[in-house]
From Swiss-Prot:
Protein name: Cobyric acid synthase
Entry-linked PANTHER family: COBYRIC ACID SYNTHASE, DETHIOBIOTIN SYNTHETASE
Record keywords: Cobalamin biosynthesis, Glutamine amidotransferase
GATase cobBQ-type domain span: 248-435
Family: Belongs to the CobB/CobQ family. CobQ subfamily.
Gene name tied to this protein: cobQ
Gene3D superfamilies per UniProt: 3.40.50.880, P-loop containing nucleotide triphosphate hydrolases
Function: Catalyzes amidations at positions B, D, E, and G on adenosylcobyrinic A,C-diamide. NH(2) groups are provided by glutamine, and one molecule of ATP is hydrogenolyzed for each amidation.
Amino acid sequence: MTTLMVQGTTSDAGKSTLVTALCRWLTRQGVKVVPFKPQNMALNSAVTADGGEIGRAQAVQAQACFLQPHTDMNPVLLKPNSDTGAQVIIHGRAVTTMNAVAYHGYKEIAMQAVLESHRRLGESYPVIMVEGAGSPAEINLRANDIANMGFAEAVDCPVLLIADINRGGVFAHLVGTLELLSPSEQARVKGFIINRFRGDIALLQPGLDWLEARTGKPVVGVLPYVMDLHLEAEDGLDQRQTDKVEHVLNVVVPVLPRISNHTDFDPLRLHPQVNLQFIGPGQAIPPADLIILPGSKSVRSDLNYLRNSGWDTAIERHLRYGGKLMGICGGLQMLGEQVHDPLGLEGAAGSSAGFGLLAMSTVLEAEKQLRNVRGRLTLEDAEVSGYEIHAGVTTGPALEQAAVQLDDGRCDGAQSVDGQVLGTYLHGLFESPAACSALLRWAGLANVQSVDYHALRERDIERLADLVEKHLDGPLLRELCGLEAN
């Protein structure tokens, strides 16, 4: 078994995308490869085949390998629920919530989980493609590191260092990061990859020559800037819009302080007939055909934020003039009458009033519901698939008019009697073409075009593998993976 790790000079340098590309590139050559990220901090997560929870980036990387996501692919997941604290998920299950200082002392236990998962994957896969987190040169985080060089040292693996030239300062990033590493860590870095380059490569060549001479390490390749990739953002909210022939349906989503699984909206962002707007703090709330309340890692505090920002008044006005309102997961809970957190799972214990638009209440419980599900929307009987990740148990008469009839016999979500308000616990439902079309028609869009989001993502994974084939040093990459040259 061989392990190759990709680390970045910064967050968003391109680590997730490169690992996805390398996974598909190797898979196309018949190599049995598996993705791995020791520790991930993200609010976007996916449900695995073994009923756990991992970062969504690793789920996409699994798709690149034609594998089902598994908890061993991301053994430690941290989901922030305040500015200083996070829920700690080990092997797909939430085990505790702690602040950053407490977690620092917990890292030894977390590292055991990381190495256990790495060992298990190594028993089934000859190549493990690893993604680091943030930067390996964060001085304040280097002690007891499990996400970058601490892991690489523990399993004795080579490292590729990637940097984003589009931000500027790429040579300072690469050389500075390298020089902040220990001698043994520096020796692990086997080469550099420059990401998101625009322009004539000949103009960059003197810098590449200098970098190789300065460090004694090769530039494995320069990847071009790629427009319109349909891969899910690991954490940061992707507010890019694709070109629209015509803005037909206006959809507005509030950017909550603790928004989670905002990848739910990627299919809408890419839909040619949808104008999707994320509205952040201080921004005017525009007119809309559909308002969607997203998932939240801290429902009660985000409810308070919405009220303080005037969303309660805006929603009331929106409904009065015939607009449609939808809530997903935490957004569903907000639509009800009360949200109770007796255990203090998302902050101080207590209760908060919801918007009172659906006759139901939610109690947050310690045991999370984690499921991949299939079913049919009660709107148009449209097929839908998605996943549940929630600690809330919702009850009340509103649930008698369900939003989804699940194949396992359960019902999900609720609709208002007048048909203006709909809520569901299902993440990812817009990825189902039939369900997305039905919901857009419900929101008022006529002549809806069907968009296959899964096909778009698969196409772009192939595009990424093509870029690796064209722009990176294939023989060196195969050597680092313990493979013979083609």
